[in-house]
């Protein structure tokens, strides 16, 4: 008698993808973090789109729009918490993914490793922009402290910071 997971047409697809996956037997759970990064990124994009439908970035109404999302939108509180905690999970998975690469010596593949480093910097820059733009007074602090690190660059640091800020100081709590 044949096993149902190998004979049933629908269960066979799941069996081939998850149970009898043609992968080496010595692969460990450390190799899941790339897939988890994809899941976290998809959750971030979807929840971010739904939150952006109700968010107002004006300094006078930003807090009211967040309370509207949490109170009046169906499962708005869940979207907000998934988005906030999903960002933390994304970076945890990202750092574990890099740590796995360091542990297994993936840095010897220089082209692949350099692409990963560029992606890491792009993710950090994107996260910085997401942190700085909408959050009110916390973004004043974040923008000032983090971008002031650029002042340490010799000769161009001052001009670079003023270019990023768009002037001599950060103007408002949000971009509007």
From Swiss-Prot:
Sites where the protein binds heme b b566: 97
InterPro entries with a match to the protein in the record: Cyt_b/b6_N, Cytb/b6-like_sf, Cytochrome_b_N_euk/bac, Di-haem_cyt_TM
Binding site for heme b b562: 83
Keyword Mitochondrion: yes
GO biological process, alphabetically ordered: mitochondrial electron transport, ubiquinol to cytochrome c
CDD domains per record: Cytochrome_b_N
Free-text comment on the cofactor: Binds 2 heme b groups non-covalently.
Topology relative to the membrane: Multi-pass membrane protein
UniProt KW keywords: Electron transport, Heme, Iron, Membrane, Metal-binding, Mitochondrion, Mitochondrion inner membrane, Respiratory chain, Transmembrane, Transmembrane helix, Transport, Ubiquinone
Function as written in the Swiss-Prot or TrEMBL entry: Component of the ubiquinol-cytochrome c reductase complex (complex III or cytochrome b-c1 complex) that is part of the mitochondrial respiratory chain. The b-c1 complex mediates electron transfer from ubiquinol to cytochrome c. Contributes to the generation of a proton gradient across the mitochondrial membrane that is then used for ATP synthesis.
Name of this protein: Cytochrome b
Species name: Tadarida brasiliensis
């Amino acid at each position: 008698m044949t096993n149902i997971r190998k004979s049933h047409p629908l269960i066979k697809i799941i069996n081939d993808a998850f149970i009898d996956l043609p992968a080496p037997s010595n692969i460990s759970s450390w190799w899941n973090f790339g897939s988890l990064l994809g899941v976290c990124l998809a959750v971030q994009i979807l929840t971010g789109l739904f939150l952006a439908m109700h968010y107002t970035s004006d300094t006078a109404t930003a807090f009211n729009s967040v309370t509207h999302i949490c109170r009046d939108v169906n499962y708005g509180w869940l979207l907000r918490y998934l988005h906030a905690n999903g960002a933390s999970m994304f970076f945890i998975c990202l750092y574990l993914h890099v740590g796995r690469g360091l542990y297994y010596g993936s840095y010897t593949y220089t082209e692949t490793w350099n692409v990963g480093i560029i992606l890491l910097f792009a993710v950090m820059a994107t996260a910085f922009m997401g942190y700085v733009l909408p959050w009110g007074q916390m973004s004043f602090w974040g923008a000032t402290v983090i971008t002031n690190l650029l002042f340490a660059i010799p000769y161009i640091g001052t001009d670079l910071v003023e270019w990023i800020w768009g002037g001599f100081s950060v103007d408002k709590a949000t971009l509007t």
